[in-house]
């Protein structure tokens, strides 16, 4: 048996087993759990790319590793499928606040998975592990979307997952297209406009000081 399991208290093992069993039989929308009978601390997952994002139509394999200090310490998350995303490093490590500073012991695996799915809709360039993806997201969304979509088409093609989850905070945020009208495009177009306006204002002040 894996050492992580051996180091977990019996009541935590029961909690994890119960939650994984529930997630397997009643998964959130667009998420599928692949149970690991030999090691329940290694949670294998398939996540469907949300509509209205460059990840749409992709199936992404990932895993959560529950360490010996779980649930006092958060699980570690990794994408096993290659993905172009600001908050996912080249080795697949996921940077999301709920897995770090915002973690609480009462938060379960379902919450973590829904948060990671949300990250596909609303990336956070401020905590980028992939600096190139973070820069493009802020400065050139069309190029970012093109790169992310290409990676999805190459590495993440698969059949559609089934399932609905009314507690999914991101389910109502989906749209029908990737560029122009998708939730990511609208958000970052607004951010880009604000930054351009601020830059113009700063440039104008500098020009006036030179007069």
From Swiss-Prot:
<comment type="similarity">
    <text>Belongs to the ubiquitin-conjugating enzyme family.</text>
</comment>
<protein>
    <recommendedName>
        <fullName>Ubiquitin-conjugating enzyme E2 S-C</fullName>
        <ecNumber>2.3.2.23</ecNumber>
    </recommendedName>
</protein>
<dbReference type="GO" id="GO:0005524">
    <property type="term" value="F:ATP binding"/>
</dbReference>
<dbReference type="GO" id="GO:0070979">
    <property type="term" value="P:protein K11-linked ubiquitination"/>
</dbReference>
<comment type="function">
    <text>Catalyzes the covalent attachment of ubiquitin to other proteins. Acts as an essential factor of the anaphase promoting complex/cyclosome (APC/C), a cell cycle-regulated ubiquitin ligase that controls progression through mitosis. Acts by specifically elongating 'Lys-11'-linked polyubiquitin chains initiated by the E2 enzyme ube2c/ubch10 on APC/C substrates, enhancing the degradation of APC/C substrates by the proteasome and promoting mitotic exit.</text>
</comment>
<dbReference type="GO" id="GO:0010458">
    <property type="term" value="P:exit from mitosis"/>
</dbReference>
<dbReference type="GO" id="GO:1904668">
    <property type="term" value="P:positive regulation of ubiquitin protein ligase activity"/>
</dbReference>
<dbReference type="InterPro" id="IPR016135">
    <property type="entry name" value="UBQ-conjugating_enzyme/RWD"/>
</dbReference>
<keyword id="KW-0833">Ubl conjugation pathway</keyword>
<dbReference type="GO" id="GO:0005680">
    <property type="term" value="C:anaphase-promoting complex"/>
</dbReference>
<keyword id="KW-0808">Transferase</keyword>
<comment type="pathway">
    <text>Protein modification; protein ubiquitination.</text>
</comment>
<keyword id="KW-0132">Cell division</keyword>
<dbReference type="InterPro" id="IPR050113">
    <property type="entry name" value="Ub_conjugating_enzyme"/>
</dbReference>
<dbReference type="GO" id="GO:0051301">
    <property type="term" value="P:cell division"/>
</dbReference>
<keyword id="KW-0547">Nucleotide-binding</keyword>
<keyword id="KW-0131">Cell cycle</keyword>
<feature type="domain" description="UBC core">
    <location>
        <begin position="11"/>
        <end position="157"/>
    </location>
</feature>
<dbReference type="GO" id="GO:0010994">
    <property type="term" value="P:free ubiquitin chain polymerization"/>
</dbReference>
<feature type="compositionally biased region" description="Basic residues">
    <location>
        <begin position="197"/>
        <end position="211"/>
    </location>
</feature>
<feature type="region of interest" description="Disordered">
    <location>
        <begin position="158"/>
        <end position="211"/>
    </location>
</feature>
<dbReference type="GO" id="GO:0061631">
    <property type="term" value="F:ubiquitin conjugating enzyme activity"/>
</dbReference>
<dbReference type="InterPro" id="IPR023313">
    <property type="entry name" value="UBQ-conjugating_AS"/>
</dbReference>
<keyword id="KW-0067">ATP-binding</keyword>
<feature type="active site" description="Glycyl thioester intermediate">
    <location>
        <position position="95"/>
    </location>
</feature>
<dbReference type="GO" id="GO:0031145">
    <property type="term" value="P:anaphase-promoting complex-dependent catabolic process"/>
</dbReference>
<dbReference type="InterPro" id="IPR000608">
    <property type="entry name" value="UBQ-conjugat_E2_core"/>
</dbReference>
<dbReference type="Pfam" id="PF00179">
    <property type="entry name" value="UQ_con"/>
</dbReference>
């Amino acid at each position: 048996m894996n050492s992580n399991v051996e180091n977990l208290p019996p009541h935590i093992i029961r909690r994890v087993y119960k939650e994984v069993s529930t997630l397997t039989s009643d998964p959130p929308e667009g998420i599928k759990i692949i149970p690991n009978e030999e090691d329940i601390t290694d949670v294998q997952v398939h996540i469907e790319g949300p509509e209205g994002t460059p990840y749409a139509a992709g199936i992404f394999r990932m895993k959560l590793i529950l360490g010996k200090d779980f649930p006092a310490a958060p699980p570690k998350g990794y994408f096993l499928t290659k993905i172009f995303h600001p908050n996912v490093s080249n080795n697949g490590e996921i940077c999301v606040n709920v897995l770090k500073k915002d973690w609480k012991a009462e938060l379960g695996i379902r919450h973590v998975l829904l948060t990671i799915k949300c990250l596909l809709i609303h990336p956070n360039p401020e905590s980028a592990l992939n600096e190139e993806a973070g820069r493009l997201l802020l400065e050139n969304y069309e190029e970012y979307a093109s790169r992310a979509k290409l990676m999805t088409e190459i590495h993440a093609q698969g059949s559609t997952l089934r399932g609905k989850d009314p507690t999914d905070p991101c389910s109502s945020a989906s749209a029908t297209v990737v560029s122009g009208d998708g939730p990511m495009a609208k958000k970052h177009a607004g951010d880009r406009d604000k930054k351009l306006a601020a830059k113009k204002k700063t440039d104008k002040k500098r020009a006036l000081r030179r007069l």
